[in-house]
Amino acid sequence: MQFATITTLLFAGVAAAMPQATPTSAAPPSATSTCTPGPVVDYTVQGNDTLTIVSQKLNSGICNIATLNNLANPNFIALGAVLKVPTAPCVIDNISCLAKQSDNNTCVSGVSPYYTIVSGDTFFLVAQKFNLSVDALQAANVGADPLLLQLNQVINIPICKN
């Protein structure tokens, strides 16, 4: 872009010189843009990791990771699992793989039938993590006191029979 003329603007006694652009023969910008995604990297799941955390660490999307790894439930990843993570995908997808929220589900599919309690867990939070009703989780764990969950305690997750 070249500046060929100068226009003077006056505002209540203030003068300012503003350059005026004149068209040049430069080529117009291309109408199509290309995207080059980043590499796919291996990531080992660590304590307290979720797909949200992993996706934020590696500039990816929850569903980009879930789809590449054929995860049946993106809300559950196993500690120590090695995930393939597409870094900097052209389209970051954080929603297409997520089930519609419902607190009435009595069972789930595609996950382990067991869950190990971690710090801060409650029956409500575990039920929410697996998209289950609290009643269904309690029914699968007769004898477990939901108010006295212990770190590393293993509880049952109700699995749907297909």
UniProtKB/Swiss-Prot annotation:
SMART domains linked: LysM (SM00257)
Any single Gene Ontology cellular-component annotation: extracellular region
Entry keyword annotation includes Nuclease: no
The keyword Ion transport is assigned to this record: no
LysM domain ranges (all copies): 41-85, 113-157
Annotated keywords: Glycoprotein, Repeat, Secreted, Signal, Virulence
Glycosylation sites: N48, N94, N104, N131
Pfam families: LysM (PF01476)
Signal sequence bounds: 1-16
Protein family according to the UniProt entry: Belongs to the secreted LysM effector family.
Quaternary structure note: Forms homodimers.
Domain text: The LysM (lysin motif) domains are small globular domains involved in binding chitin in eukaryotes. Slp1 contains 2 LysM domains.
Note: In plants, chitin acts as a microbe-associated molecular pattern (MAMP) that is recognized by lysin motif (LysM)-containing plant cell surface-localized pattern recognition receptors (PRRs) that activate a plethora of downstream immune responses.
Annotated protein name in UniProt: Secreted LysM effector slp1
Gene: slp1
